[in-house]
């Protein structure tokens, strides 16, 4: 995947970004024909298979988006490229540009960066949360619902720790985005202060915090958890010591142990160490014969050492089986 900027050296002043206005980087840009030709050369040499295209804002949002669309259009129309193109939608782009992006791209995205307008104002004062970020995301969501854009959908990104937000705020924004904006994925980026930016003196955000957000996100998207079930502490933070699924299980002893041979697939995926695929395999496996030992858990793809304290195998605690392995 070629990840590239159409232009560097931005007109906006997001406090965390190395490309911010007045930053130390050298401003440069590529014309659509230049970038399209360079990508095709890499494609022909089999060094890349797809394009992830973003840009710093140069000459205004509309002109910047036009250059990006120009690159994508050359690849599709002139060079006949049918592979993966991910287009970042520049905040401030016109609705017709968003429509054009959906006709050209496999996936589109606009970065929320923060969970609310108040948080965004602290870190990206030049961006308008509702008009420039949420509005185009709603436009894409409407197209998805109408069946006009059904490829890889849209994604977004949240910066972690830049605006004093809580983990609950971030996960609340993600849950809302999955529900209302038809998001395919939310990505989380732990703030790592860049020299020469207003946040240069801050401590970097631990990557474990980012990791816990991703784990909680998976619980929302793939494990049937609601936002209210994510185990935040009293301050709205996720534990850095224990993963959220295990912590939820520890906080709900009334739900465990689960009998693997009788539990629904929905209950199995809530067991620490059992994911959607391994839960499905266990359901299929037990149709042929009872699941009686940890070897069967391992065969199904479950992390049996993690799952064992939370399950019964044919009526017996799985912990007793551990001595055999």
Which role fits each region the language model picked out?
Residues 2-156, 160-165, 195, 200-202:
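Conserved Radical SAM active-site core
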Residues 289-294:
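Short, basic-rich loop-to-helix N-cap that marks the start of a DNA-contacting helix
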Residues 285-286:
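Residue-level signature of tetratricopeptide-repeat
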Residues 100-109, 113-114, 176-183, 307-310:
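Structural recognition of alpha->loop->beta junctions
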Residues 132-140, 147, 164-244:
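A structural motif corresponding to the C-terminal lobe/cap of the Radical SAM core domain
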Residues 268, 281-282:
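Short alpha-helical segments in extracytoplasmic peptidoglycan/chitin-binding modules
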Residues 198-270, 304-325:
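Long, highly charged, low-complexity intrinsically disordered interaction regions
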